[in-house]
Regions:
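Glycosyltransferase-associated regions of secretory-pathway enzymes
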Residues: 1-135, 151-281
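Small-residue hinge/turn detector
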Residues: 136-148
Length: 281
């Protein structure tokens, strides 16, 4: 199986669209008029910052994910590696290990105290006590503030990033098993107009979904509310000029355990892949 690593346009009509199915019946999600920034000057010509971001909050990080972060740094030596944490993530011994391996650890809640946007992000995070939900929001903000690439932490790193990872991108797949743009792996510049569109429309998306369950949030709706379904709606609405679409076989679904794309890791084509541990459930 052969496909380009980067495409400039994909067939949006083939993407799964849960917001056009049962959600509209309940809360008219597809009728939401999101507000967007002026994208006329967006041409994806700025090289991204050389940062890679991971998140682990809610419990002490385990050995598997600790080694994931360290291995990413060993492979991508020219990148700064950030692990975003809360007060539960690290022991003194683990912190020493990360520092000895040049991993930057930052408490996300120490970042959300300075301005109106940060307070807004903090308020959205606090609406639901589910770490998958919180991580969906955190990943958008940390890449907006620092720039670079976000990856879920249940990942395996195989080879260094190259020129394919210089410019803003999202990761997609369109095949017989699934067709979507997910949020487990993406890259944007600091202060990206696209990420600002994501962030500024979070509240409207979250509040819409909360209508389903008497102002509560149910776990099954998180991907539509803050995850891949949410960002896909915004990408389809705007079709940002020259945004890169990276096939997930090269960065998410190329692992040896996969059905369709296992050859990508076996043949050295994947840069990394994810193991889908469902660690936020």
């Amino acid at each position: 199986m052969k496909m380009d690593i980067i495409s400039k346009m994909i067939d949006f009509d083939k993407l799964s669209k849960p917001w056009f199915q049962y959600i509209p019946t309940l809360c008219k999600y597809n009728e939401l008029n999101f507000k967007y920034n002026n994208k006329d000057n967006y041409d994806n010509s700025i090289i991204m910052e050389k940062n890679i971001h991971f998140i682990w909050i809610g419990s002490v990080i385990n050995d598997k994910y600790m080694n994931t972060v360290i291995n990413c740094k060993k492979i991508n030596v020219n990148y700064s590696i950030y692990l975003w944490i809360d007060e539960n993530t690290l022991t003194p011994d683990i912190l020493d290990i990360f520092e000895n391996n040049n991993i930057i650890t930052k408490n996300i809640y120490n970042e959300l105290i300075n301005d109106e946007l940060e307070l807004y992000v903090y308020n959205q995070i606090q609406k639901f006590n589910n770490y998958g939900y919180k991580a969906d929001i955190i990943r958008l903000y940390i890449v907006y503030k620092y720039g670079g690439i976000y990856s879920d932490i249940d990942s395996v790193w195989l080879k260094p990033f190259d020129e394919n990872f210089q410019y803003e991108f999202v990761a997609y797949r369109i095949d017989s098993e699934c067709s979507d743009i997910g949020n487990p792996f993406f890259g944007f510049c600091k202060n990206s107009i696209i990420l600002l569109d994501f962030l500024q429309n979070l509240e409207k998306s979250i509040d819409c979904i909360m209508k389903i369950n008497d102002n509560n949030i149910i776990q099954a709706n998180i991907p539509i509310m803050t995850g891949g379904g949410f960002i896909s709606k915004i990408l389809i609405d705007n079709k940002y000029n020259n945004l890169n679409y990276m096939h997930q076989a090269y960065c998410v679904i190329g692992g040896p355990h996969e059905n369709l794309y296992s050859s990508f890791s076996k043949e050295g084509k994947s840069y990394c892949y994810q193991t889908f541990d469902k660690n936020w459930c």
